[in-house]
């Protein structure tokens, strides 16, 4: 395995050489749990899940950390607007994100730390920064002195002279570009004690402290969305380096999901929530779609593109399932060399999928020609490749989902048929009011009823 990854900091493809042979340490900036996840949020989870699976497939021991930002201005503001405690608001949407990742078959992280659980580590890092002359306390706040770090801007390419003032003007700042490590206590906001007064952490400090705590002063890969390069990741580097850490050796960033050429964003109002999209397609089809573009590319959303992605996945799935039906059990084999070359080339999933589809065409020819053993051998290869991409249709995650859905449908069938029998009885008695009331209630529940010569049949409306 010679895995090459595009490192944002050096702007070049680099051979992956872990700090410890056979071990890989990865930090992914997770969710700020201010609201329901949209498909732009979960793209990073899907993209870097493929990286993790590829490392695991090559027998790496992978420590994968994905944090939860559960204290932040937007969380506090939205909770206050809704009249709910901030911690309840954060916990509610943390569960929403966990559900979304689980639905899409994203492997759970090795650890998923919350910012509020690591205040001690943040205070310790701030103390080191102050002791090293890179931070200062003023008016209850603590600021990072950007001029004290000559390499500020190395990740993003921003020159310090071109950087505008930080997130707030801050009357106590030495330089308007200095950013906040710690925010002084405000009435009605949560706060924690520090040597510089009560307050709460700044967003950038949270990730640096948690990455160091779980992965050490130096670790292999830091991942996140392209929008995090500046200022978030730039500030993470500055904090960590000035606190004495070597920090991340590789920086990987995924592109956005866009609509009409604009980044999907709550502030723009152009978001598609994961639950709503899952009314249109199955979870594995959404995952396939989100993962089908190169992780560094922008993914322009449209209903047509989503439908095409779902149809492409169903063609692959159909081959695997038909083969298992006709040729017997399809075990997981070995991926092809072309597939491996694609993923080793900066996780080039489009090229990897081209190989998968080529194998599916080859397998369908074998299957239709009666070469069952040949078809089964190809299906085994396809399963291996799909497993790395997280969409193997015979994987327990997806088969259990199908079984659960089938059980739910069976239970629903019992209830609906009881209502249909009630409707049939009412019609036989010419009690049209009751018959219409049953029909209308089923329609409101998203159930369509078709009267056939063999009696009424029901189905869920599309998107239910």
From Swiss-Prot:
It catalyses: tRNA(Cys) + L-cysteine + ATP = L-cysteinyl-tRNA(Cys) + AMP + diphosphate. It holds the Pfam family DALR_2. ATP binds at residue 266. Zn(2+) binds at residues 29, 207, 232, 236. Binds 1 zinc ion per subunit. InterPro entries: Cys-tRNA-ligase, Cys-tRNA-synt_Ia_DALR, Cys-tRNA/MSH_ligase, Rossmann-like_a/b/a_fold, tRNA-synt_1_cat_dom, tRNAsynth_Ia_anticodon-bd. This is Cysteine--tRNA ligase. It comes from Rhodococcus opacus (strain B4). The gene is cysS.
């Amino acid at each position: 395995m010679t895995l090459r990854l595009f490192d944002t900091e050096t702007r070049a493809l680099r051979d992956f050489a872990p700090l410890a042979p056979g071990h890989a340490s990865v930090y992914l900036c997770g969710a700020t749990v201010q609201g329901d996840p949209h498909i732009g949020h979960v793209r990073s989870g899907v993209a870097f899940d493929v990286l993790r699976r590829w490392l695991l497939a090559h027998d790496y021991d992978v420590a994968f950390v994905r944090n939860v930002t559960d204290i932040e201005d937007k969380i506090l503001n939205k909770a206050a607007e809704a009249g709910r405690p901030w911690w309840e608001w954060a916990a509610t949407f943390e569960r929403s994100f966990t559900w979304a990742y689980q639905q899409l078959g994203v492997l759970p992280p090795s650890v998923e730390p919350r910012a509020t659980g690591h205040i001690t580590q943040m205070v310790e890092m701030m103390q080191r920064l102050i002791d090293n002359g890179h931070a200062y306390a003023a008016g209850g706040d603590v600021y990072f002195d950007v001029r004290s770090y000559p390499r500020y801007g190395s990740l993003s390419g921003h020159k310090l002279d071109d950087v505008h003032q930080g997130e707030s003007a801050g009357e106590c700042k030495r330089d308007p570009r200095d950013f906040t490590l710690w925010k002084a206590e405000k009435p009605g906001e949560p706060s924690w004690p520090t040597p510089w007064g009560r307050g709460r952490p700044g967003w950038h400090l949270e990730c640096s402290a948690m990455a160091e705590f779980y992965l050490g002063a130096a670790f292999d890969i830091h991942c996140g969305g392209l929008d995090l390069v500046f200022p978030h990741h730039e500030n993470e580097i500055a904090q960590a380096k000035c606190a004495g850490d070597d920090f991340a050796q590789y920086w990987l960033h995924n592109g956005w999901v866009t609509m009409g050429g604009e980044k999907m964003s709550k502030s723009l109002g152009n978001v598609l929530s994961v639950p709503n999209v899952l009314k249109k397609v199955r979870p594995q089809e959404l995952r396939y779609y989100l993962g089908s573009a190169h992780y560094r590319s922008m993914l322009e959303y449209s209903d047509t593109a989503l439908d095409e992605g779902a149809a492409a996945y169903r063609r692959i799935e159909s081959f695997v399932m038909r083969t298992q039906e006709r040729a017997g059990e399809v075990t997981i084999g070995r991926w092809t060399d072309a597939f491996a070359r694609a993923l080793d080339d900066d996780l080039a999933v489009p090229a990897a999928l081209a190989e998968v589809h080529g194998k599916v065409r080859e397998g369908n020819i074998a299957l239709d020609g009666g070469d069952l053993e040949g078809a089964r051998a190809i299906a085994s290869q396809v399963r291996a490749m799909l497993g790395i991409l997280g969409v193997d249709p015979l994987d327990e995650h997806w088969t259990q989902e199908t079984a659960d859905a089938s059980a739910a449908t069976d239970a629903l069938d019992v209830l609906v048929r009881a209502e249909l029998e009630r409707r049939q009885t009412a019609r036989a008695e010419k009690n049209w009011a009751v018959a219409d009331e049953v029909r209308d209630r089923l329609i409101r529940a998203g159930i369509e009823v078709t009267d056939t010569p063999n009696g009424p049949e029901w189905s869920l409306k599309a998107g239910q």
